[in-house]
């Protein structure tokens, strides 16, 4: 959430930065609410000080021998009660304005970093680097074709069980998925991440704190009878691990690695990636998440991206890194690096991880602070996929194709999965 002080005192700065995102927003009304709320807060504070002064005066009068039931003390008490009533009215008005202000602030996206390249769409993203040599051959199968041939997952029965855009992993496919999850978690924990396995049902406050609500309500699955939602990413519950907390500065950075199933309605994606593992309502992902001191966030962004890249490098999967332009940034992000893995069968790079620095945007929504000496300030948060498991499997299937139809797996994965190749069962 954007700092309301910036809305009150420098709305033109917000307007300029949102314009970089391609959004023209008139903040005049929001600034007026912020100033009214601040004015009420100051008036209430003044009244409370007057009330405290009157209360002390009553005590001094009685201590000095005045009759507690006399007219002089009664007049002071009457004055104090009148002040209390005014304070209560101001508190209600201030509460209403604060709620109105927060609701509007929650709908505004994060302000892009000065380092973020300007642009309107994904066409303006900047390629930063590449790793590995993409395999380019004629006649290679796409991952869903390989999966059908090797009976790695079943989509038709999944429609019967649920609906379209679900898969049931079978046999070697299920085993490979489990192996990838364990491989990723082991790799990250070996680098100092603390593994967590959070709830996959989260409340509205958690989704709001991480930035999914109110904007992405239509993208999410919600329980009918409870204030619970199926989490779209482990970023949501991990953000709320420290909601409403003050983290001692000497404990930062906190680095978590979390596996979870993820659930997304994928509204607006009708007709896209209808076959295979690329775009599903339910998928597995290993998430990386950092809580850092504000001075460390840029360095941390480079490191969390490198940690996601390490998975692709360990599996020998060629990829490229894109610095997303302002017009393609996610709602909560200040700056984002996308990792796109090469899919030889499809002949294209596809996103497999987004690594974002969010500044204090999520921390302000979730009231996550740190204390360094006497000073309390908001932490900065970062998140990244490390990695999306289904898309990693898709890349492995297409990259490991052999002339005999088998799929050769990377050597580091063999101890986890128990075999070197995927073959017809």
UniProtKB/Swiss-Prot annotation:
GO cellular component terms given for this protein: cytoplasm
Highest rank taxon of the organism: Bacteria
Primary residence: cytoplasm
PROSITE patterns associated with the record: AA_TRNA_LIGASE_II
Pathway named in the protein's UniProt entry: Aminoacyl-tRNA biosynthesis; selenocysteinyl-tRNA(Sec) biosynthesis; L-seryl-tRNA(Sec) from L-serine and tRNA(Sec): step 1/1
Binding sites annotated in the UniProt record for L-serine: 233-235, 287, 385
Catalytic activity: tRNA(Ser) + L-serine + ATP = L-seryl-tRNA(Ser) + AMP + diphosphate + H(+); tRNA(Sec) + L-serine + ATP = L-seryl-tRNA(Sec) + AMP + diphosphate + H(+)
Molecular function (Gene Ontology), one example: ATP binding
Residues reported to bind ATP: 264-266, 351-354
Location(s) in or outside the cell: Cytoplasm
Classification via Gene3D superfamilies: Bira Bifunctional Protein, Domain 2, Serine-tRNA synthetase, tRNA binding domain
Keyword line: Aminoacyl-tRNA synthetase, ATP-binding, Cytoplasm, Ligase, Nucleotide-binding, Protein biosynthesis
Subunit structure: Homodimer. The tRNA molecule binds across the dimer.
Domain comment as written in the entry: Consists of two distinct domains, a catalytic core and a N-terminal extension that is involved in tRNA binding.
Similarity annotation: Belongs to the class-II aminoacyl-tRNA synthetase family. Type-1 seryl-tRNA synthetase subfamily.
Protein name as it appears in the record: Serine--tRNA ligase
Organism: Synechococcus sp. (strain CC9902)
